[in-house]
Amino acid sequence: MNTLLAKKKEPIDKLAAASAGGRSLGAEAFRRMLRSPVAITGGVITLLFLLLAIFAPLIAPKDPQIRYLQDQVELGKGIIPGPSPGFPLGVDDFGRDFLSRLIVGAQQTLLVGVLATVIGVLIGVIIGGLAGAFGGWVDTVLMRLVDVLLSFPSLLLAISIAALFAKPSQWTVILAVSIIGVPIFARLLRGSMLAQREADHVLAATSLGVKRGTIVFRHMLPNSLGPVIVQATLTLATAILEAAALSFLGLGDPDPTRAEWGLMLGNASRQFLDIRPELAYYPAIAIIVVALGFTLLGESLREALDPKNRR
């Protein structure tokens, strides 16, 4: 009897793999993205940003913390040394090389964006998975909580969460940005899980008496993560923008020695925008370009995986 049951269960796994698309679907999506100028543009921007962030300490021409020209800075007189052979973008109000700080700032920006996105995905997957797997009152309670979070504008919610902490830090920014991403991932996974409950391989497993936990973790959850992965790419762009906004508003890490694009933009805008406005433009442009890269890549990935676009 056990042997017969095991033989019946084998086609279930094959059916589940077929519904997920397997490697062929991933390869087809990858080929479609290679033919898309939008995907290539987003991929190139994202790759360059990742390389810059990973190897920032090696790429930066100077130490971003050393105050090379501090003796030449006179904010009261409106004097901040501009570009020179040794300092292509000039220096900031502490006399530190601005190009080096801009390069090293990519590392901090990536760290905040990735951590906020990962935390948001993990919490959202747990909430959405529980709601989709159990349904009933569990689904009702969790989704009402999600609705409460969705009722607030994302940036306003992030500001409110960050403002709750007496001492702002990098972790308060990560926590605030991650929380606003939770309801998005929770709803996405819940919807996918509900659709999977009616899939053929899940119904077959249920009829054969497979344990509920096995059905959820082996058949439903793996086949429901596709939309979450795509959304994570898009959310990373949003996380970078919102983290920069919090730092710009003074709700991030106030440490002046930390090189972070949002903090650099905020300091330049508040203290010496009329003296050296380009020092505000550089981090602003960097934030916009990186967010655009992740957005283009995420949208291209979504289109490539969309069943309606398969040929």
Regions found by a protein language model. Name each.
Residues 1-125, 129-130, 137, 155, ...:
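Gly/Trp-centered helix-boundary motif
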Residues 18, 22, 91, 134, ...:
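Residue-level signature of the cytosolic catalytic core of signaling kinases
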Residues 55, 107, 149, 153, ...:
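Residue-level hotspots within pore-lining transmembrane alpha-helices
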Residues 56-64, 132-136, 161-167, 250-255:
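Short helix-capping/hinge motifs at transmembrane helix termini and TM-loop junctions
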Residues 88, 92, 98, 119-126, ...:
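Generic hydrophobic transmembrane alpha-helix motif, especially the helices
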Residues 107-123, 213-246, 294:
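Transmembrane alpha-helices
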Residues 150, 162-165, 193, 235, ...:
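Glycine-rich helix-loop "coupling/hinge" segments at transmembrane-helix boundaries
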